[in-house]
């Protein structure tokens, strides 16, 4: 079993080399745990959530067999952050007007008035 928990934290993505057991993260050499949008800045529907989870799986599969390092986690986290931005810009994801944070961290909402 792994002794050290590696993690990557971006604004909307948190990755851990751990398994979630009950409410605790337990370090693991062979499992990554994804915490998506911990501040609830976006409104997620099943389709957009599935797209991010699918992209996460693609990135993990592409990195399989390589060294699991801080660098690898940062690459995956940064790529997911960019993918979330693409979804937002395409109108497949929107900001949560009831979220505790309203700083439009990925740009202003795309509305007909602003286009």
Curated annotation (Swiss-Prot):
Classification via InterPro entries: NdhM
Major subcellular site: membrane
GO MF assignments: oxidoreductase activity, acting on NAD(P)H, quinone or similar compound as acceptor; quinone binding
Membrane topology, record value: Peripheral membrane protein
Reactions this protein catalyses: a plastoquinone + NADH + (n+1) H(+)(in) = a plastoquinol + NAD(+) + n H(+)(out); a plastoquinone + NADPH + (n+1) H(+)(in) = a plastoquinol + NADP(+) + n H(+)(out)
Domain of life, per lineage: Bacteria
GO cellular component term of the entry, any: plasma membrane-derived thylakoid membrane
Keywords: Membrane, NAD, NADP, Plastoquinone, Quinone, Thylakoid, Translocase, Transport
Location of the protein in the cell: Cellular thylakoid membrane
The UniProt record lists the keyword Coiled coil: no
Keyword Disulfide bond belongs to the record: no
EC code(s) of this entry: 7.1.1.-
Record's function text: NDH-1 shuttles electrons from an unknown electron donor, via FMN and iron-sulfur (Fe-S) centers, to quinones in the respiratory and/or the photosynthetic chain. The immediate electron acceptor for the enzyme in this species is believed to be plastoquinone. Couples the redox reaction to proton translocation, and thus conserves the redox energy in a proton gradient. Cyanobacterial NDH-1 also plays a role in inorganic carbon-concentration.
Family (UniProt): Belongs to the complex I NdhM subunit family.
Subunit structure: NDH-1 can be composed of about 15 different subunits; different subcomplexes with different compositions have been identified which probably have different functions.
Name by which UniProt lists this protein: NAD(P)H-quinone oxidoreductase subunit M
Taxonomic path: Bacteria, Bacillati, Cyanobacteriota, Cyanophyceae, Synechococcales
Gene from which this protein is expressed: ndhM
